[in-house]
A protein has these predicted regions:
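Left-handed beta-helix
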Residues: 80, 89-207
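Unchanged
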Residues: 1-133
């Protein structure tokens, strides 16, 4: 399976779900082909944004410039309806995990598709994990993810600020607190409490 990185306003999603009076709503994102994976599910939606088909992603079915409606695996479900689904499923010979149960029910229950238009990264392998981190060096993507309407606050460590020696050379990089930097860093993300000596050179890396 894949994970998604995004900052979604759940209150807005719940409002749309309630206004449309559906038992289930699912968030999707139109993704470029190069960011898709065979583990992703693709949604087809009709003119009312109702999910009409769910299928596994197959790269051979899409052109390079296509935008593909990828399911994010984020759902809003009425509580009573969810309980009834799970009560029925528990008596099956091989009960499905919840994420598969919900995915399989999208068409049957005429689920509403909710398009997410903000920053999102589909993380399904080491490269996509690396790319998601490198995206944070882009100010627009960084702001969209961490400083949207609902801001993200990381855990406070109350450490001293990172120290940059006179010998340090820094280009397009981000640093957490508590580090000592004496060498050269470019296009990289450096975590807390890292020590880079004078002769060290870090490039295009996550440390």
């Amino acid at each position: 399976t894949a994970d998604v990185l995004c900052n979604i306003n759940l209150e807005q999603l719940i409002h749309v779900h309630e206004v449309n009076q559906r038992n289930m709503s699912v968030v999707y994102k139109k993704m470029p082909k190069e960011q898709m994976s065979s583990v992703n599910s693709v949604l087809n939606l009709d003119e009312t944004d109702t999910v009409s088909c769910v299928k596994d992603y197959d790269a051979s079915h899409y052109a390079e410039d296509d935008l593909i409606a990828m399911s994010t695996g984020i759902y809003i479900i009425n509580t009573d309806f969810l309980i009834s689904l799970m009560e029925v499923e528990q008596y099956e010979e091989s009960p499905r995990k919840l994420r598969y149960l919900l995915l399989d029910k999208l068409v049957d229950v005429a689920a509403l598709g909710y398009e997410y238009a903000g920053y999102m990264k589909n993380i399904h392998d080491v490269k996509s994990y690396y790319d998601a981190n490198m995206d944070m060096l882009d100010p627009q993507k960084f702001t969209s993810l961490l400083h949207a309407t609902q801001k993200v606050y990381t855990k406070v460590k109350n450490e001293e600020a990172t120290y940059f020696a006179n010998s340090s050379e820094i280009f397009n990089s981000q640093f957490a607190s508590g580090s000592v930097i004496e060498g050269r860093v470019e296009n990289s993300i450096i975590s807390r409490r890292c020590q880079l000596e004078k002769e060290a050179c870090i490039s295009d890396s996550i440390i």
